[in-house]
Swiss-Prot record:
Family as reported in the entry's similarity comment: Belongs to the UPF0134 family.
The organism's taxonomic lineage, starting at the top: Bacteria, Bacillati, Mycoplasmatota, Mycoplasmoidales, Mycoplasmoidaceae
Highest taxon of the lineage: Bacteria
Stated name of the protein: UPF0134 protein MPN_139
SUPFAM superfamilies assigned: MPN010-like (SSF144266)
Length: 163
């Protein structure tokens, strides 16, 4: 006796056996991957032949009180998640404010650095001009000393002619 029952894989078949608790068979089965079915050989109970799990008689129904407790616990979890999200949002807002303040400080400092750089460039230009003037004056004094030395040498030559 062969019968094909649509289970998609071995795990699904075993899950079905666990769900029904009454599903028993004796024999073997082959999972056919081409048409996604399981091929059985052996004897089955009615439950597996129909491929419908039978709800056990001892199933408990949920009472209104249990449902309300479940609903309340879900509401509590949701409110907890909401408060966590709000607190994280507040922390994010604080961090954004700090970042904004830091960007303002960076902008102010960059402006200060620019003005200091311009002032430094002006000082360097002035220093350069002063150095050039001092070098020029030193050069002039050296030429004056050279002229004076020439004058002194000519006078010495006149006083004491070379032999």
């Amino acid at each position: 006796m062969k019968e094909k029952i649509p289970f998609y894989n071995e795990k699904e078949f075993h899950d079905m056996v666990k769900k029904t608790k009454k599903g028993t068979f004796s024999g073997w089965y082959i999972i056919n991957k081409n048409n996604n079915s399981v091929e059985f050989s052996g004897s089955f109970n009615r439950q597996f032949k129909l491929n419908k799990p039978v709800i056990p008689v001892n199933t408990e129904y949920v009472t209104r009180k249990e449902f309300n407790e479940y609903k309340d616990s879900n509401d509590q979890r949701l409110t907890k998640i909401e408060t966590e999200l709000k607190s994280q949002g507040q922390r994010i807002q604080v961090v954004e404010d700090k970042v904004d303040r830091l960007t303002e400080v960076v902008m102010v400092q960059s402006q200060q650095i620019k003005t200091q750089g311009e002032a430094m460039n002006a000082r360097m230009d002035r220093f350069e001009s002063l150095v050039l003037k001092s070098l020029e004056s030193i050069g002039n004094t050296l030429t004056d000393f050279g002229k004076r030395l020439d004058v002194i040498e000519t006078r010495l030559d006149k006083i004491d002619p070379p032999k």
